[in-house]
Amino acid sequence: MIETKVSKGIISTYFEKLERNLDLDVAIVGGGPSGIVAAYYLAKAGLKVAQFDRKLAPGGGMWGGAMMFNQIVIQEEAIDIVKEFNINHEKYEDGLYVMDSVESTSALLYHAVHAGATVFNCYSVEDVIFKNNTVSGVVVNWTPVLREGMHVDPLNILAKIVIDGTGHDLSLIHI
């Protein structure tokens, strides 16, 4: 039956993806623009990178632009990155450019994944693995599990490097 084939396809391929990412070069906590760009450049350099974002849709606050006007403004210093990600943009005033926030966020995610990064959405990092006086991984659980206060054991993911890309929250630092 097609229904069970669909379910088996989702379960088996997701399990394989998760298993492939239990031991990483780099774990990035947070799926905002800085974390996504870091994932892109690190994966492009050949490192095994996974990004963990607590939201259903990674991208941080970029989706909404400013006050849900889905336009964003960037400074001249970031224009080379915008061009590398092939994001449409137009000059606004001296040193400022405007772009569509939805296109921009989508482009960042698309390029990070195509460079080889794996993005896990709806994952919260609830702790870090600390061995030999160094952070050596993250402890993850599904965001809805934590939000509901369920007592469900997390999973451990090893990483040579852990990056806090949680933006304004600095969630990882407060663990």
Language-model segments: residues:
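A conserved beta-strand/loop element that lines the FAD pocket in flavoprotein oxidoreductases
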Residues: A115-V125
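N-terminal glycine-rich dinucleotide-binding loop that anchors FAD/FMN and/or NAD(P) in oxidoreductases
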Residues: G65-N88
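Conserved beta-strand-loop-beta-strand element in the redox core of flavoprotein oxidoreductases
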Residues: I129-L155
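Conserved small/polar residues in nucleotide/adenosyl-binding loops
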Residues: I173-I175
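Short hydrophobic core segments
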Residues: I157-G167
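Glycine-rich FAD pyrophosphate-binding loop
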Residues: K44-M62
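Extreme N-terminal leader/targeting segments of oxidoreductases
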Residues: M1-D25
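N-terminal Rossmann-like FAD-binding beta1-loop-alpha1 element of flavoenzymes
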Residues: L24-L47
